[in-house]
């Protein structure tokens, strides 16, 4: 049913401006205070008047901050000692944090402020105590090295724990206070430190490998030059007067010719590599393509209730062979030579050309480790003059090692080419995904329901957004809105907003991250509701539920909703209908994690753990594959991954738990890890342009309009779900609802105070109608619920002319 979405209440502009001005004023005040205190501390002179002593030279102050600065410095040194120098730095750190979040709305929290203040107190006490224990104070300063606080705490701790125990205690308190005061995550510090260490190690290792390679090449060149000199001296020797010397020279030449002929015979006996046939165009299109080529009999019926034709996509270009068997064999022989230069004996077993890359399957000699070949990937790329070389260590069912080398002329894999295949047409799942072609040019078709969730990551320009569009269009070409529904979350407000208005959407494209959290909460509540329905029906998954509902409808005995709560004996439970598969697409997962934070991670983990049987699936995409975004909790529950080109091996390991994604070519080149395996498949993603997406969206708009559910973005709890919806902060008064007056008018005219009646009349959700009835009860319009579940209308009816 069609529902209207009320406009969210916005914060008044004057309040926003006031918050920003107050925040700017606080920044200026704190910055000036930090500079003033540091200037006072650095120019402290004991001859100046202060709090701890008097001075006969009161008229002249040496401190650059003046009389007040001298007093402030004396107080800080007297109380904190050397730690007084750190105190302005702590204020500066907090000022910097406020500056970083200056564009966010100001939200005061007394509990959070108290927690930060406790952290500052721990910092000051622990720092002063450590200064007193480990430093000696100068005679030109008042008090001790740790001030009064440090002296008292340090002496007490030394008597109880000795110096070592006291140091350990105060260091722990100092780190705890620093974490609480500045929100510093030590796990993130360790991750960054480890990443820098690994990058430096790889840098030094690469430099060492280059040096050893250059050294070996120089040695080989010197040896070759010496051999040439020896040949010249042997062959072009001066005429010897002795006949015996001439005979020996002839024998040496004959021996060299015999050895050369033997070497040529061995090369001729070498078995050439088997070159696999090139990927040709599909032998025959799918039945759907042939059916769409037939002209429809009635123009009006060609749109209503049908899927968009694949012909609205750009057709695939005619494939032409851009190589020859001789060139492939030459590259294979060159590969053997280059690996032999690095001390690795191999032989090319087979060659598999593809649209983007060519895989050379090599057979290593006995005793050669695969790791030696993997470590030579960059050196091979340099030797072969290509952008990157990827080494496939394990090929299932074979004893060979794969070396993937990019082609000189790269072919474009069109999206229409993948959709026209029988593999896509014969797939029965409503959430079938057409990814692209594998290295051999065969289509890669997968089922999102079997994944059941997908994690996509890749840097900017790697083809990640095009891949997400291809997945969405795969669903739009496969199923109608009665079979699949979409919830799209687009923090960047650019990628997914193009799909606004298609009938598959359950709610408008979400760009506000607070609404994104509400959408995920609704998904969890819907998951719980579906599980309760399936438990009542005695089925185990969504397909079994839909089958049972369909059989009941075909038999003329539709099933009633067993979870419906009746308010009176006159209420009738609504009939069960087919439940569609729901796909939640998040384009930039990192932005949502940064803004909403931990609660989104928990919601996603809960959906990923349980939502498979309920027919709710996630597609999470991010261009920042770091461990603070793709956490262990998310990775553990989403085993299916898709890695586009990334910048480092660490990012590749974060996504697919192994290297390789950093050696991809970009522009849709990906490593796809199917469910149930740890061996990624290299896939060349299908290209879909923005114009094609627009054409598909317009075609679906002609076939229907969206049926939005207002409860999704309102963050409302579903009845009987057992899950706290956690709506927006503070909540809203139901009387401010845009439809509240219309609901009161309906109740007064019909004299029926029923939630279900209001729900059917206004075409809204159950929870919204219940809130309106409760608001009428608070306002005295209707009575509270009687024993039989009914209510009486107290207010008089409207006056009629």
UniProtKB/Swiss-Prot annotation:
- Residue ranges that the UniProt entry lists as topological domain Cytoplasmic: 188-801
Q: Where in the cell is it found?
A: Cell inner membrane
What GO cellular component term, any one, is given?
plasma membrane
Q: Biological process (GO) annotations?
A: cell division; chromosome segregation
One GO molecular function term of this record is: DNA binding
Q: Nucleotide-binding: present as a keyword of the record?
A: yes
* Topology within the bilayer: Multi-pass membrane protein
Region Disordered, residue ranges: 715-735
Q: Does the keyword GTP-binding apply?
A: no
Q: What family classification does the UniProt entry report for this protein? A: Belongs to the FtsK/SpoIIIE/SftA family.
Subunit details: Homohexamer. Forms a ring that surrounds DNA.
Q: Domains: what does the record tell us?
A: Consists of an N-terminal domain, which is sufficient for the localization to the septal ring and is required for cell division, followed by a linker domain, and a C-terminal domain, which forms the translocation motor involved in chromosome segregation. The C-terminal domain can be further subdivided into alpha, beta and gamma subdomains. The alpha and beta subdomains multimerise to produce a hexameric ring, contain the nucleotide binding motif and form the DNA pump.
Q: What does this protein do?
A: Essential cell division protein that coordinates cell division and chromosome segregation. The N-terminus is involved in assembly of the cell-division machinery. The C-terminus functions as a DNA motor that moves dsDNA in an ATP-dependent manner towards the dif recombination site, which is located within the replication terminus region. Translocation stops specifically at Xer-dif sites, where FtsK interacts with the Xer recombinase, allowing activation of chromosome unlinking by recombination. FtsK orienting polar sequences (KOPS) guide the direction of DNA translocation.
Q: What is this protein called?
A: DNA translocase FtsK
Taxonomic placement = Bacteria, Pseudomonadati, Pseudomonadota, Gammaproteobacteria, Pseudomonadales
Q: Which gene encodes it?
A: ftsK
